[in-house]
C-alpha cells in the first residue's frame, strides 16, 4: 500500500507539471495588467496579434468583465501595457508602413512606445510616440517599458539587444548586452538574446530578462553616465557544462566560457 501511495503522489505531481507546461505552450501572446481607478477593477490588455509572425491585428484594450470598454488598434502589435498616474496608457508597440527608415528600405517597420489617451475625443487615441526603424518585424520589438520617477522611460530593445532610457524623445542612457555577452556579427539579423523585460528595482537599478541566456541581470546606471552589471541571476560557474541548456537548440551559450 505504501508503494501504491507513493506511485499515486508521483503521478499527481507529473500530471500537474504536464498541465502547467501545456498551459504555457498554448497561452495567448497578450500582456495584461489590473486597473483600479477607485471605482471598479478592470483588465488592461496588450495584444501582439496574429497572422504570420504574430504581427497582425494587434491592439491595446480595457476589459471590464467580458465587455471591451475601449480599444486602440492602429498598430500591427502591442506588447506590455500599463496605466500611468495621469490616466494615459504606456504601451510597447510595433507597426509597419513608415517612410522614415534610416539604413533600411522604405517602407519599413518601427518599434517603440506609445502613450494612449483612453478618454480622447472620438475614442482611445495615440497622443505621443517614440519609435525607430528596425530591419524586420521578427524578434525586433520594444517589448517592455517602465516609467521613471523623474520623467522619461526605461525600455528593452530586442533589435539591438540593449536597454535604454528615453527622455523627451532622446536616448539619454544605454546598456548594451554586448558588454557582458559575446555578440554575433549583426544582432539585428538573428534572435540573439531576446531581451524582453525590464523592471526598476531601485534608484538607477534595473532587473533585465535575458531570455535566450536563461538569465536575469541587474544593471546599474552609474553616476558618470556609464553602466555596471551588479548581479547575474543563474550565472554560469567556471567549468560548468552547458549541454543541458544548449542541447535542444533553445538556449544559447554566449558568455564566452568553454
Predicted regions and their residues:
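Hydrophobic alpha-helical segments
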Residues: 1-258
